[in-house]
Swiss-Prot record:
Membrane topology: Multi-pass membrane protein
Entry-linked PANTHER family: ANOCTAMIN, ANOCTAMIN-10
Key words, A-Z: Cell membrane, Membrane, Transmembrane, Transmembrane helix
Sequence ranges on the Extracellular membrane side: 229-240, 338-352, 422-500, 575-590
Role this protein plays: Does not exhibit calcium-activated chloride channel (CaCC) activity. Can inhibit the activity of ANO1.
Record flagged with keyword DNA-binding: no
Molecular function in Gene Ontology: calcium-activated cation channel activity; intracellularly calcium-gated chloride channel activity
Name this polypeptide is given: Anoctamin-10
Length: 659
């Protein structure tokens, strides 16, 4: 019997809840009933054909506090059909990666009719999210019970419910048993070991697994730099000419690790299926607004906004504001140097041990101020980028990343460039770099993980006491879990995590010939970062929906750009050293020309290495080429079959006319 969506039952009273929908407390009953009917309705009737029930039944509502929470799930067959709809790629029995189809399900590795583990829980939740987001308005002109909440044909109902405040949040539930197993193999025992990246991917999805994979790879890639930099730091502190070898190694290292990462990333994402997964058509982001019109691509009615108006907002408002923030950052930097001069003069006047400690205070204060400014600017950048009214989420993210990277780069490194190339004080440069690096690492650990974890523990204790005080006769395990998770913070993505690594990469690579110990501090920080980030994902934030990814995206370009800038800075610093200057006592022009020539040679070597190392391993390239060939052959056969059917129909019609 061929299974189709129209034959599936959506009235199961008991099912495994995967996703929670929270409604506002004052939502009207007719709205709840309408939403329920749309979620459980069959696909042919415009529904999502999912399983849906309130968290509390009538009896439990009398005993427990009603929270307007609803559980969403799906039958195994419905999830498999959904996997085909979203284009999930799975491994076949012949070891090839192909898009999953329900009709050919037995050709896929690990599939059995009675096996519910073929799809990971992250994939199941991603499918449900996709189905909820693809619930479209049909004939309704408004949300029942809310005449002010207008609906337009073809637009996403869930996004409209969220923007109108009827639905307050939609989030996936944790699987407590699977989470406990993951924690045991991931971070509960502090040890120098590889992370369970495949298990992280199965639980949290590809985007988060790629971040932890990159964090692990970057940490181990830093170890050679740390080992080589340690003796340089201990034995040749002032001999800058001897740092030429170390700086040259650093420049080659930064290129090789980024190219090798691309190959490793291709291996991982091919194994996960996201490298060959077809990109879904991108819908307008929830915050996008404009005059109602017809989309020329989809033919659907949706808000339209002139790109000319958007460009005006960017160049007349956003750009001047960013420049103003950059100016303010430079102004704060000059105040920091005034504080340095004050501390130095105080120490020279007294010469005591206490005033020698005071020399580090301006750098520590400045590092804290930098972190505060970075976070305040982030909020301003998000507001401005949202106000620019970008239609697509990808465009929004690209503009946000550009704003944040430019400001963070200047805010974190401007003082170091000023010390290096204006003041030319290498001792102060070492001191400032070390202070900024270590202080920022400590602050990030406390603010991002430890403080939120402590606050979450306090809230968990309050909820548990509240539930235990009810002394209800019903099982409150699921109720307590949902209540705890709904109040957890929302994980906003890997943006801040990659940004932290990007800045760390800058501290390590930009001034490596002055402070070789930076790599060692980065390694120590990253070993604790793995555990604190894992704790953050498992215990501090709500479980995020899985997002398929084939790479680390724009961050690859950001790291490569930083490595190019590091070539210029290290060559300039070596050229400024007294030992190198002594070789050219008469003509500084010759020195400048040689430094520029060496810098160009290193950049040329860098780009040659990047070109010589393929982004994808040979065997992956062959498999991708084979998949493309099979796809073209299948399309060709489908067209030939269609032509044959048309010819057959024409032949039959001609035969009828002849008789």
């Amino acid at each position: 019997m061929r299974v189709t969506l129209s034959t599936l039952d959506t009235c199961e009273s008991s099912f495994t809840p995967l996703v929670v929908i929270e409604l506002a407390q004052d939502v009207k009953d007719e709205t709840k009933e309408w939403l329920k009917n749309r979620i459980i309705a069959k696909k042919k009737d415009g529904g999502a054909q999912l399983l849906f029930r309130p968290l509390l039944n009538k009896y439990e509502k009398e005993t427990l506090e009603n929270q307007n929470l609803y559980l969403v799930g799906a039958s195994n067959v419905r999830l498999l059909l959904g996997a085909e709809a979203v284009g999930l790629v799975k491994e076949c029995t012949d070891a090839a990666m192909r898009a999953f189809t329900y009709g050919t399900r037995h050709n896929f590795k690990g599939f059995h009719d009675n096996n519910n583990d073929f799809l990971t829980m992250a994939e199941c939740q991603f499918i449900i999210k996709h189905e909820l987001e693809n619930l479209r308005a049909r004939d309704e002109k408004m949300i029942p019970g809310y005449p002010q909440a207008k609906l337009y044909p073809g637009k996403s109902l869930m996004r409209r419910l969220l923007t109108s405040g009827i639905v307050t949040q939609v989030f996936p539930l944790h699987d407590t048993e699977a989470l406990k197993k993951l924690e045991d193999t991931w971070y509960t025992r502090f040890a120098l070991k590889y992370q369970p990246i495949d298990s992280i991917r199965s639980y949290f999805g590809e985007t988060i697994a790629l971040y932890f994979g990159f964090l692990e790879y970057f940490t181990f890639a830093l170890i050679p730099m740390a080992i080589i930099g340690l003796p340089y730091y201990l034995f040749v502190w002032e001999d800058y000419d001897k740092y030429v070898i170390f700086a040259s190694f650093n420049l080659i290292w930064s290129t090789v690790i980024l190219e090798v990462w691309k190959r490793g990333c291709a291996n991982m994402t091919y194994r996960w299926g996201t490298l060959v997964m077809k990109r879904q058509f991108e819908e307008p982001r929830p915050g996008f607004h404009g005059v109602l019109g017809i989309n020329s691509v989809t033919g659907r009615e949706e808000p339209l906004y002139s790109s000319y108006k958007r460009q005006l907002r960017i160049y007349l408002v956003s750009l001047p504001f960013v420049c103003l923030c950059l100016y303010f950052s430079l102004y704060v930097m000059m105040i920091y140097f005034d504080m340095e001069d004050w501390a130095l003069s105080l120490h020279e006047d007294s010469g005591s041990e206490w005033t020698s400690l005071l020399l580090y205070v301006p750098s520590i204060v400045y590092a804290v101020v930098i972190e505060i400014m970075n976070r305040l600017y982030r909020y301003a950048a998000e507001f401005l980028t949202s106000w620019e009214n970008h239609r697509l989420e990808s465009a929004y993210q690209n503009h946000l990343v550009l704003k944040v990277l430019v400001f963070n780069f200047l805010n974190c490194f401007a003082s170091l460039f000023y010390i290096a190339f204006v003041l030319k004080d290498m001792k102060l440069l070492r001191q400032s770099l070390a202070t900024l690096l270590i202080t920022s690492q400590i602050l990030n650990q406390v603010v991002e993980s430890l403080l939120p974890y402590w606050l979450q523990r306090k809230y968990c204790a309050r909820v548990k006491r509240k539930v235990q005080a009810l002394k209800s006769e019903v099982d409150t395990t699921l109720y307590e879990q949902v209540l705890l998770e709904k109040e957890m913070g929302t994980y906003l993505g890997t943006f801040d995590d990659y940004l932290e690594l990007f800045l760390q990469f800058g501290y390590v690579s930009l001034f490596s010939c002055v402070y070789p110990l930076a790599a060692a501090f980065a390694v120590l920080n990253n070993f604790t970062e793995v555990n604190s980030d894992a704790l953050k994902m498992c215990r501090v934030f709500k479980r995020p929906f899985a997002e398929p990814s084939a790479s680390i995206g724009v961050w690859q370009l950001a790291f490569e750009t930083m490595s190019v800038i590091s070539v210029v800075t290290n060559c300039a610093l070596i050229g400024m050293s007294p030992q190198v200057n002594a070789v050219f006592p008469e003509s500084k022009t010759d020195l400048v020309l040689i430094v520029v020539a060496v810098e160009h040679a290193l950049l040329a070597l860098k780009f040659i290495l990047a070109f010589a190392i393929p982004d994808k391993p040979r065997h992956i390239q062959q498999k991708l080429a084979r998949l493309e060939f099979e796809s073209l052959e299948a399309l060709k056969q489908q067209q030939m079959k269609l032509v044959a059917e048309n010819l057959k129909e024409e032949y039959q019609e001609d035969g009828k006319e002849a008789t």
